[in-house]
């Protein structure tokens, strides 16, 4: 990744299994200025058992009587759909990403030529999964929701031992609750990850709004991932906790502004304020008329604007010197 923040617009399963909706999501992400749009790749039978229950937030936004398997089955994207979406992303000049949730999906995304793999928080303790992705030697973005430092370390070690270069791993601090309560965000943990592992870090956000994403960038995040939708009122598990198009665009603008605002870290006057030095700073001036030969003292000199004369930091040096010319009141010394 470059110094520019890599913004991932997370479409996830907000396409509701509809390729037309998926393409509209790509349009929105590209128009907003995101760097990538991310989907999810899975086969329901490989991901959950038929008796698996849905999360509480999923029960609130989907049919309460259907199982997690039934919900997810409707959201699968087949191989041809993946190919069509990848081609559409190229047309829109935005990177296609997808999170694989099972072995077959890892193979599919590798065959489709993805150079970056996103590992979700739920797979951070899945040893066979980590070994399979690690063996591909791709760039990896690893979400760390629900994990402690020991689990993150074990996942990194597995990826590296399997063939991934350490420097090709980026870590995303995350909280997997949709939406995440503000008191549970713990953005400082992102810095802990950076200090502990020396890797590029970012934030995968599930809070409502955009302020936490902008704060994360100000704290050093190099990757931001955020769910978005065409309409929060659409049926499906994640729409309600996602940004709508105008909110996504506002987040991207905010992040790009913070990128500029962070600067180079050197303390100096900026180009835009250079002309203000003469206007806002002060110089040593004549407090009253001064004749040639008089001695400068606190009685006949003072400090006033403008700032293009003798710097007042030289006050002690000037006091006691002999005036070499005549000065009128307010003349620069």
Residue ranges of model-derived segments:
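Catalytic cores and adjacent flexible loops of soluble metabolic enzymes
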Residues: 1-333
């Amino acid at each position: 990744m470059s110094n520019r923040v890599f913004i991932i617009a997370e479409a996830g399963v907000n396409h509701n299994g509809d390729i037309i909706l998926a393409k509209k999501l790509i349009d929105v992400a590209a128009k907003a200025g995101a760097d990538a749009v991310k989907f999810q790749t899975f086969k329901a039978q490989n991901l959950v058992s038929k008796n698996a229950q849905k999360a509480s937030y999923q029960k609130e936004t989907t049919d309460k009587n259907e199982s997690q398997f039934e919900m997810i089955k409707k959201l699968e994207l087949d191989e041809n759909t993946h190919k069509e979406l990848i081609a559409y992303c190229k047309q829109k000049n935005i990177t296609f990403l997808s999170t694989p949730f099972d072995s077959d999906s890892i193979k599919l995304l590798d065959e489709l030529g993805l150079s970056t793999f996103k590992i979700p928080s739920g797979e951070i303790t899945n040893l066979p999964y980590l070994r399979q992705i690690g063996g591909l030697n791709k760039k990896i973005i690893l979400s760390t929701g629900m994990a402690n430092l020991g689990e993150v370390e074990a996942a990194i070690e597995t990826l590296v031992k399997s063939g991934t270069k350490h420097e090709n791993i980026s870590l995303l601090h995350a909280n997997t609750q949709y939406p995440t309560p503000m008191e549970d965000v713990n953005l400082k943990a992102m810095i802990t990850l950076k200090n502990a592992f020396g890797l590029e870090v970012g934030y995968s956000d599930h809070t409502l709004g955009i302020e936490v994403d902008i704060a994360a960038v100000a704290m050093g995040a190099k990757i931001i991932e955020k769910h978005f939708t065409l309409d929060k009122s659409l049926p499906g598990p994640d729409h309600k906790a996602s940004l709508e198009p105008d909110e996504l665009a506002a987040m991207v603008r905010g992040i790009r502004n913070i990128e500029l605002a962070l600067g180079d870290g050197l303390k100096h006057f900026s180009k835009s304020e250079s002309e203000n030095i003469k206007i806002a700073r002060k110089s040593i001036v004549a407090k009253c008329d001064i004749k040639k030969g008089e001695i400068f003292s606190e009685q006949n000199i003072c400090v006033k604007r403008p700032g293009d004369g003798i710097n007042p930091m030289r006050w002690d040096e000037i006091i006691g010197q002999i005036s070499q010319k005549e000065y009128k009141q307010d003349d620069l010394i």
